[in-house]
Amino acid sequence: KQAFISGMSGVVTDIKNLAMAEMPIYVVVAAVLSLLILLLTMDSLVTPFIFLLGIGMAIVYNMGTNMVFGEISYITQALTAILQLGVTMDYSIFLLESYEANKVRYDGDKNRAMAHAISNTFTSVTSSSVTTIAGFAALCFMTFKLGMDLGLVMAKGVIIGVIVCLTVLPALILCFDKAIDKTTHKNLIPNLDGLSKKIVKGWPVVLVLFLVLLGPAMYGNSNYEIYYDIAGALPQSLDSAVANKKLEEKFNMNSTHIVLMKNGMTSKEKSERKLRM
């Protein structure tokens, strides 16, 4: 290559290109891992796909409504799908479990069971979603604009996730109800009643154990390093990393400094100012 671009401009450009290129990959990986976990923990082969379909729609709605902000950071764009998938999955599980319980209670009346399930789910997820929204909204008070950017997008994403869970997902469950029943199988997770009884019976031991572990946890919290070198965290094969390395090797410098001087200074004054730096 004839030329290289170093400094923050090159680093920021490489971070943006890397994040946008890898975003589809880790979104697919997250979806596959979520699907595998749901297949292991749910008692129907169809429900995991319904959950991911509903959450996928909520993510698309959230991404689409970002146009109201005019623009968002590429970092927010890269993180939103994964975060929304993680924080809103529980709402779908609440709805399905409530629906299954009410279906038994109302002797197979699916519409009535789903109506009560929606009501029960709304009550259950209200406090959970409100605290989640408040947590993301707190980011808006950061001076760093990225905090407001990420906070607003994710708070909106949680709201949309709740709305989809209470509107679109019930329709999907009712639509595929027969398929859900036909693919129902024995739960692959072993019964934990025995462990639950032991924990309840031996709660003083559990409490003491966690109090003992609190000390090492507090020590660890105060004794790990935080790195601030963004460029050093990037793959060394990126153009900006290659440029910075060549800058250091050929010119014995790895950072650029800009000196601002008053207009009209004489050469002597400039030399004296340089010596004082």
Whereabouts are the PLM-identified features?
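Membrane-embedded transmembrane helical bundles of large multi-pass transporters/channels
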Residues: Q2-Y228
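Surface-exposed amphipathic alpha-helical segments in non-transmembrane regions
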Residues: K1-Q2, M277
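Juxtamembrane segments of multi-pass membrane proteins
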Residues: S196-K198, P204-M277
